């Protein structure tokens, strides 16, 4: 539709009532698609709700915004936080027109910085179409023009462009034969619909479906999470299309525990959570060999989540972590009195070129959260075993585990023998996963089927966490593969980021494999609250785009509505079809495009008196540090204060899922060059690193990327 209205269109931005879409056009075909990753925050319904709160209509709200002299800066965060910002602005005396204008800016900033991730207006290309019902709001249109500094085309039917495009497509494919299936005017007089409700029993989700039967006998199903429910028929459980999520889940948890009389050391419970989706085969084999009967917690479901809600200390933690509470409760409800849930700081180092093999802070330490928040663990009859374990150091494990299980008097020789069996099973499973991946790829190649590598963490295997997205992919006629089934060590390093998390190292490897395979695409799963993905998502995108591929991210949490996921997957499928493998294979592929040369701060620069910019990170300590650095002969300038402009720069050049301090600190540094207060050819920047599993270790990589995107890649970054 946009191409028909503006031939040669380069970008299409669509903001509707519930979602945002950005289409980049190249050679008259969709080159990439970006959709808001999850909720409808910052879309048309967002403005409508605020207009009603202010006692006016959307049209009246927009008219007031156009009269504003001082729009309020309300940020681009979640609607919940925006509500707080609006209330604060009202307390400070802001007028309705200024609040309305501020909200219009927020909607556009949300689209530009979170969805499009715009670094420069030039990235939009010469011809831009804006559409969707939200752009019928003149205030939103004007905010877009002011923020991008360019005029755009808004069709008069902006809210109906989807229908217009569908009509154009129908006309293009019309053979001139047959009759339209649209309801005739005379049939509308007899139109009626009967509504019934039914529970789908095709999987454990048990969706509550609404079935609408129309007067002509056709039916429409709503409320279903996947295509199986829409069919109203029992589809065979075993599809020919590969679904490695289903296969791997059953393989990992398919072990048979010892019988009671063989388990001479008794029962021990293990929760089916987080890194157990990676390590359960290892721990099961170890404990079974030692004579324990391993009792696994049940499959996750929403009722299990609700069982543990009272002990969840933070609403901001990711859903996979929230589920842990319910799993521990379920084990205790079964009468298990010994629960083993270790804190694994380091995983095995499986990727030789990776910088480290940490687990993320949540995965590594969540047993401590459980210990300190689950009151039932204070029962003297309950033993909760949560030692800190380093799986990358095999030599120390026998002695360490003997200490952990001291009450069972296990000798170091017995523990060593059991560990050998555990390592064998762990290696066998990992090889089996790779073999299964190769088998599935070969099958898809022979049957001309496209595959989606649904990449995330091991715990995204959990159907309660992935909400049936693998089945949705299979329902669209594509195979669903896991990232560890396709990572084969072909990625060239070093990466821009510090590659320090074990699960993400193979995520990067899988991205390289996907980029090299014309029949594979990648969809990255991201759980709400995962701060690490602010680092990984950009790196995966660089790897894929360097190989001419599309990067798609799906954000998921405890809400099981898959509407946004379904839109994104279908959009991806349509974009791939339109682009075609022929074009992809003809593209120039840069397998090293993700590798960037780093500019070093040299002795010559220091002797020449180069300025070093330091952000304000700790006022008391830095007030002492800067004079010390001056005494050492370094020309250091401390950036004392932040401003709305520095935050705006941070939003523009840093992934908006990064923590607020990262946006402020990095925005502060880059803004010095953007505003012309620092010479990029005689200035370096300095930033600290934690050196641990926290994402703060990657502040330096975020800074390097931001400087490069802003056009200052020659600036040295000093990180320590």
Give the location of each predicted region:
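Active-site nucleophile and cofactor-binding loops and adjacent substrate-binding regions
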Residues: 1, 13-17, 34-42, 100-105, ...
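An N-terminal assembly and electron-transfer interface module characteristic of large anaerobic redox
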Residues: 28, 39-47, 54, 157, ...
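Conserved phosphate-binding catalytic cores of ATP/NTP-utilizing and phosphoryl-transfer enzymes
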Residues: 1-13, 21-28, 119, 163-174, ...
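A mobile "lid/hinge" subdomain adjacent to the ATP/sugar-phosphate binding pocket shared
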Residues: 65-98
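Acidic-glycine-rich active-site phosphate/pyrophosphate-binding loop
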Residues: 15-26, 77-87, 134-149
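Phosphate-binding/catalytic loop of phosphoryl-transfer enzymes
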Residues: 1-60, 91
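Glycine-rich phosphate-binding loops at beta-strand->alpha-helix junctions
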Residues: 106, 119-145, 158-159, 275-277, ...
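Phosphate/ATP-binding catalytic cores across multiple sugar-kinase/actin-like superfamilies
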Residues: 99-123
């Amino acid at each position: 539709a946009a191409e028909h209205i503006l031939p040669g269109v380069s970008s299409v931005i669509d903001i509707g009532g519930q979602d945002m879409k950005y289409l980049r056009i190249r050679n008259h075909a969709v080159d990439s698609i970006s959709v808001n990753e999850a909720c409808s925050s910052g879309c048309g319904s967002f403005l409508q709700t605020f207009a009603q709160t202010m006692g006016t209509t959307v049209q009246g709200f927009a008219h007031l915004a156009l009269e504003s002299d001082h729009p309020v800066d309300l940020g681009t965060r979640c609607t919940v936080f925006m509500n707080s910002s609006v209330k604060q602005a009202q307390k400070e005396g802001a007028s309705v027109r200024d609040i309305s204008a501020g909200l219009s800016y927020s909607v556009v900033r949300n689209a530009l910085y979170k969805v499009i991730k715009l670094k420069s207006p030039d990235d939009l290309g010469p011809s831009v179409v804006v559409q969707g019902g939200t752009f019928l709001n003149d205030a939103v249109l004007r905010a877009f023009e002011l923020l991008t500094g360019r005029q755009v085309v808004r069709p008069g039917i902006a809210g109906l462009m989807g229908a217009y495009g569908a009509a154009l497509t129908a006309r293009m494919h019309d053979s001139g034969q047959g009759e339209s299936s649209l309801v005739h005017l005379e049939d509308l007089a007899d139109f009626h619909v009967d509504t019934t409700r039914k529970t789908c029993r095709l999987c454990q989700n048990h969706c509550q479906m609404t079935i609408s039967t129309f007067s002509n006998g056709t039916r429409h199903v709503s409320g279903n999470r996947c295509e199986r429910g829409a069919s109203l028929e029992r589809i065979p459980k075993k599809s020919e299309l590969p679904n490695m999520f289903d296969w791997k889940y059953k393989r990992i948890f398919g072990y048979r525990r010892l019988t009671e009389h063989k388990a001479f050391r008794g029962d021990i419970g293990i929760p089916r959570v987080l890194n157990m989706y990676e390590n359960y085969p290892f721990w099961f084999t170890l404990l079974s060999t030692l004579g324990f009967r391993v009792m696994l917690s049940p499959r996750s479901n929403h009722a299990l989540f609700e069982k543990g809600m009272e002990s969840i200390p933070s609403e901001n933690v990711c859903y996979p972590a929230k589920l842990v509470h319910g799993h521990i409760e379920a084990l205790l409800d079964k009468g298990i009195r010994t629960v083993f849930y270790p804190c694994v700081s380091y995983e095995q180092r499986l990727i030789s070129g990776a910088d480290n093999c940490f687990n993320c802070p949540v995965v590594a330490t969540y047993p401590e959260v459980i210990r300190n928040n689950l009151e039932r663990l204070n029962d003297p009859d309950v033993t909760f075993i949560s030692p800190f374990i380093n799986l990358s150091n095999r030599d120390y494990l026998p002695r360490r585990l003997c200490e952990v299980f001291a009450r069972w008097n296990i000798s170091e020789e017995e523990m060593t023998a059991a560990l050998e069996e555990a390592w064998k099973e762990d290696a066998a499973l990992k090889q089996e996963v790779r073999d299964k991946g190769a088998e599935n790829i070969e099958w898809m190649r022979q049957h001309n089927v496209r595959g989606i590598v649904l990449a995330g963490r091991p715990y995204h295997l959990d159907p309660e966490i992935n909400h049936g997205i693998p089945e949705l992919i299979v329902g669209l006629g594509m195979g669903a593969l896991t990232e560890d089934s396709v990572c084969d060590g072909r990625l060239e390093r070093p990466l821009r980021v510090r590659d320090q998390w074990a699960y993400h190292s193979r995520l990067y490897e899988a991205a390289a494999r996907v980029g090299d395979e014309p029949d594979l695409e990648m969809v990255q799963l991201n759980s709400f609250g995962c701060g690490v993905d602010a680092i990984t998502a950009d790196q995966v995108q660089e790897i894929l785009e360097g190989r001419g591929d599309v990067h798609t991210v799906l954000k998921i949490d405890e809400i099981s509505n898959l509407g946004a996921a379904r839109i994104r997957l279908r959009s991806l499928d349509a974009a791939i079809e339109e682009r075609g493998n022929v074009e992809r294979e003809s593209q120039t592929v840069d397998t090293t495009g993700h590798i960037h040369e780093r500019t070093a701060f040299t002795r010559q620069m220091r002797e020449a008196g180069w300025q070093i910019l330091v952000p304000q990170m700790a006022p008391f300590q830095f007030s002492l540090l800067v004079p010390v650095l001056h005494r050492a002969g370094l020309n250091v300038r401390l950036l004392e204060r932040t401003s709305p402009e520095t935050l705006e720069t941070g939003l523009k050049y840093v992934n908006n899922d990064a923590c607020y301090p990262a946006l402020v600190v990095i925005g502060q540094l880059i803004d010095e060059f953007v505003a012309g207060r620092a010479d990029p050819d005689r200035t370096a920047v300095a930033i600290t690193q934690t050196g641990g599993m926290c994402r703060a270790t990657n502040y330096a990589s975020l800074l390097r990327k931001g400087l490069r995107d802003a056009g200052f890649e020659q600036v040295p970054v000093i990180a320590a």
